[in-house]
Amino acid sequence: MQTIMITGCSSGFGLETARYFLEQGWKVIATMRAPQEGVLPASDRLRLVRLDVTSAQSIAEAIAEVGEIDVLVNNAGVGMLNALEGTPREAIANLFATNTLGTIAMTQAVIPGSERAEAGPSLILPRRSPCNRCPCWLSTPRVRRR
C-alpha cells in the first residue's frame, strides 16, 4: 500500500487531496499545525500528525513519527490578498517562511530517508500556482530520481 504525506490538510487543497487519496486506498498521513479529528473520514489508513513547516523541531518530530513515505505533497501554505504597500513586514516574513522555506525544509527532511531506503519517496510535489512558482532548483536529480 502506498503512503502519501500531505502538509497543510486542515482545509482547502490539502484537505481535498487527503480525501482523494483515502478514497483511492492509499495510506494517508495528513499534517496540520493543530490536528482536528473529524475533518477527514475515520479510517485505519489515516494518520493525523502535528506539523508546523516553519519549525525545524516540528519537522524533525513529524518525520521521525511517520517513518517511510512514498510521496510527499508540500501543500502547507498561507495566502495574502493585501496590496504590498499595506502589508506588514511580519506578514510577508510569515508567508515566505511557510510557503518557500517550509517547502524547502520538508524536502530536505525527506531526502535522507529516500537515500537510505530503496523505496524512499518516489515523488516530492511542491505547491504551485501561477503566483507561487517553486524555484527550479528544487527539482534536482536527487529529488526526481525515480
Question: What are these model-derived regions, one by one?
Answer:
Residues 83-84, 91-94:
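Substrate-binding pocket helix/loop in short-chain dehydrogenase/reductase
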Residues 123-146:
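Catalytic loop of short-chain dehydrogenase/reductase
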Residues 10, 18:
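N-terminal Rossmann NAD(P)H-binding glycine-rich loop of SDR-like oxidoreductase domains
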Residues 43-56:
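Rossmann-fold cofactor-recognition segment
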Residues 54-67:
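Conserved Rossmann-fold cofactor-binding substructure of NAD(P)-dependent oxidoreductases
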Residues 107-108:
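A short, exposed helix-loop element centered on a Lys and neighboring polar residues
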Residues 76-80:
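Conserved NAD(P)H cofactor-binding loop of Rossmann-fold oxidoreductase domains
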